[in-house]
Amino acid sequence: MISVPIEYYLVVAAVLFLIGSIGFLLRRNLLVLLMSIELMLNAVNLTLVAYNRVHPHDHAGQIFTFFVIAIAAAEAAVGLAIVLAFYRIRKTMRSDDADLLRS
């Protein structure tokens, strides 16, 4: 079986994180911002799992990955609830309008 070098995992994780950070910085749609955050968290998960491939007897990478997945699920649930409430009030999904929370 062919083993994939650790550098490939890290390059893919860096590209995912870069795409997520560019999406977070440049886009104004709240749902796209949440998806960009999720993409960055998945890049971190990939890095942690790659760490676990280098150190197979240390399960810290997998344990931290489970914590990050749990935090990402909570962040997605709370974030989507806030976006839905904001959309019901303002009828828009633009993050520029989020500073106008008072009516």
Curated annotation (Swiss-Prot):
> What Gene3D superfamilies does the annotation carry?
1.10.287.3510
Catalyzed reactions per annotation: a quinone + NADH + 5 H(+)(in) = a quinol + NAD(+) + 4 H(+)(out)
- Top enzyme class of this protein? translocase
> EC no.?
7.1.1.-
Q: Which GO terms describe its cellular component?
A: NADH dehydrogenase complex; plasma membrane
Presence of keyword Translocase: yes
Give the protein family: Belongs to the complex I subunit 4L family.
* Source taxonomy: Bacteria, Pseudomonadati, Myxococcota, Polyangia, Polyangiales
What name appears for this protein in its UniProt entry? NADH-quinone oxidoreductase subunit K
- Which source organism? Sorangium cellulosum (strain So ce56) (Polyangium cellulosum (strain So ce56))
GO biological process terms, semicolon-separated: ATP synthesis coupled electron transport
Q: Which PANTHER family match?
A: NADH-UBIQUINONE OXIDOREDUCTASE CHAIN 4L, NADH-UBIQUINONE OXIDOREDUCTASE SUBUNIT ND4L
User: Which Pfam families does the UniProt entry name for this protein?
Assistant: Oxidored_q2
What InterPro entries has UniProt attached to this entry? NADH_UbQ_OxRdtase_chain4L/K (IPR001133), NUOK/Mnh_C1-like (IPR039428)
